[in-house]
Regions:
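Family-specific signature for flavin-dependent thymidylate synthase
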Residues: 1-261
């Protein structure tokens, strides 16, 4: 029988700030006292530090007096980020990127995920190069009444992948790689679109806010709700200031207090 899988979500990369370079810049513009106040690690890490740095650059709001138009400076990072969200100054969120490894997600899911192009980058396991031997598969909850039939069908498709590769002599010595690639590419057409695959996904904070909201909405595709429900949990903990307005309702929808940022 095919291997039954479930999506696994890993946050594998987050922003890292060069504090010495940041300090040198701030010294040049007269804002070094801000970093002294702000340099203690906060719950939002370097991602939120970078967002705040970008935002304060726009108004030269490192401290009162640097910009004659600025008479009051929010010193609390969370309050500052809340004002960024409230004023829809979303461009500064685009400086901070986070990378996720999505393991055992279906190609149904990845086909929808990669439609989010702005502020995102993807690298997906290629079935043109990676030959299918074991087909991982997750039975969607709505198909539970016909689970056995689903798994038997996937098993037959898996057996075909193996038998076809044998019949086409793919593992015989001396078969050129370009031949293996051509056959592997052809065989993927006989694989279920629901098979499990992996994709690396990078998104900036602005995009993450948008996608988490859209893909956990009540009408979103079931597996996408599962994947981005978990992404929402991770980002609520990872960037608690930028996601401070997000709340999860009883339906599992992540809803922001400020939807247009």
């Amino acid at each position: 029988m095919p291997q039954e899988t479930a999506p696994e979500i890993y946050l594998i990369a987050r922003p890292a700030v060069d504090r010495e370079a940041m300090r040198a810049y701030l010294s040049a513009v007269g804002g070094e006292s801000w970093l002294e106040r702000r340099d203690s690690p906060g719950p939002g890490g370097d991602g939120e530090l970078l967002v705040e740095f970008a935002g304060r650059t726009c108004y030269r709001s490192w401290e009162p007096g640097l910009n004659p138009n600025v008479t009051r400076v929010r010193e609390d990072p969370r309050a500052y980020l809340n004002n960024i969200l409230k004023s829809a100054h979303g461009s500064v969120l685009e400086h901070a990127n986070y990378t996720f490894a999505l393991h055992n997600v279906s190609r149904v899911a990845t086909h929808e995920i990669v439609r989010h192009r702005a502020g995102a980058a993807y690298s997906q396991e290629s079935l043109r190069y990676v030959r299918l031997v074991d087909i991982g598969f997750r039975v969607p909850p709505v198909l539970e009444p016909v689970r056995q039939q689903v798994l038997e069908l996937v098993e037959r498709l898996e057996e075909f992948q193996v038998s076809a590769a044998m019949a086409l002599h793919l593992d015989e010595e001396g078969i050129p790689f370009h031949v293996k690639k051509e056959v592997t590419s052809a065989l993927r057409r006989l694989a279920p679109i629901g098979l499990s695959t992996d994709i690396i996904m990078t998104m900036n904070l602005r995009t993450l806010r948008h996608v988490v909201q859209m893909r956990t909405a009540a009408g979103a595709e079931e597996e996408l709700r599962l994947i981005f429900g978990r992404v929402g949990e991770i980002m609520k903990a990872e960037a608690s200031g930028v996601f401070q307005d997000f709340e999860r309702d009883q339906r599992g929808c992540w809803e922001p207090g400020f939807p247009k940022v």
